[in-house]
Amino acid sequence: MQNRYIITTTINNPTDAIHKFDNMSDWKLIVVGDKKTPSNYNLRNGIYLSPEDQENYDKDLSDAIGWNCIQRRNFGLLKAHQLDADIIATIDDDNIPFDNWGKNLLVSKNVDLDYYETDEIVFDPISVTNHNNLWHR
């Protein structure tokens, strides 16, 4: 079985989404805290990286990233790599997953897809989809 990890950052107590991700048996959750994250943050199954854990891991990197930003998740990516992750998914801590989340992955599979090429300097890939509700990240 593949070694699958879910990475997110948070400043909140565990949300409904976090509880659902934390209870997935075929994924392991890593939550990266920030200075605003409650100090008593706790997961049943997953790994919580406190600000202190991050600073102890690599103070220079912590200082370079800064606080109160999503880039703190890099510590989660490093931890997953250290734990020999085969697949890593990044999520938001407030987006509750559908029941089929993480199932039927296309990783390492051949799939048909549309390919777009342009000579323009900038290309908006969402403009060529049928998904007008998507937003740029």
Describe each region flagged by the PLM.
Residues 1-30:
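N-proximal low-complexity "stem/linker" segments adjacent to membrane-targeting elements
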Residues 12-14, 37, 96:
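Surface-exposed, flexible loop/turn segments at secondary-structure boundaries
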Residues 32-36:
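Acidic ATP/Mg2+-coordinating residue in the GHKL
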Residues 37-84, 99-113:
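Active-site-proximal specificity loops/subdomain of glycosyltransferases
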Residues 88:
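Short aromatic/hydrophobic "clamp" motif used to bind/position activated sugar donors
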Residues 91:
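Catalytic metal- and UDP-sugar-binding loop of GT-A-like glycosyltransferases, i.e.
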Residues 96-137:
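Conserved donor-nucleotide/metal-binding helix-loop-beta segment in metal-dependent transferases, i.e.
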